[in-house]
Regions:
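Alpha/beta enzyme core
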Residues: 2-173
Length: 173
């Protein structure tokens, strides 16, 4: 059962208890927020993370962004950035690499931190489409679904999904 389903059935999970204690709110406040979609608690079946509640009625969170580029691919530097962000008190981490071996970079970053790690599957899909087909506009939808699943299986806890991207937008990229 997932957190949303548990919350809707009235079940307060361990994650909800942890968030309530950290935020100074009641467990039922967190449960109701999760059930109604106003609070999220990024978790993953693939790895343990520092539990963090994000949403309405909770403190503002700090999200640190890291990632390689086509100009600089230094995984050790990205891992050090992730560790520094965690030491500095970041609540979550976005891994936004656009250069290098995406899965290897993300795997190593995910292994190096206890923070919830987010990603943007569309970035990888665009770059792979440009490499494979010569242009972003030739991206195949199955590639986006495959990449999204791969990133989830690596242990990313949340994703930015760009639902407003359409064919006309892609032609301009």
């Amino acid at each position: 059962m997932g957190l949303i389903e548990d919350a809707r059935r009235g079940v307060v999970t361990e994650e909800m208890r942890i968030v309530a204690a950290a935020e100074g709110v009641t467990e039922d406040f967190v449960r109701r927020g999760v059930a109604e979609g106003h609070i999220v608690i990024p978790v993953s079946p693939y790895r343990k993370v520092k539990i963090c509640g994000i949403g309405e009625g909770l403190r503002t969170k700090v999200n640190a962004s890291i990632g390689t580029s086509s100009d600089i691919v230094d995984v050790d530097m990205e891992i050090e950035k992730a560790r520094q962000a965690e030491r500095a008190g970041a609540d979550t981490l976005m891994e936004l690499s656009t250069g290098g071996d995406f899965l290897e970079i993300r795997r190593r970053v995910v292994e190096a931190t206890t923070l919830s790690v987010g990603s943007v599957p569309l970035y990888q899909a665009f770059i792979e489409a440009a490499r494979k087909h010569g242009a972003v506009v030739h991206m195949e939808e199955d590639d986006l679904f495959r990449i999204t699943a791969e990133q989830a299986k690596l242990g990313t806890n949340f994703m930015a999904i760009h639902t407003g991207i359409n064919y006309e937008t892609m032609k301009r990229l």
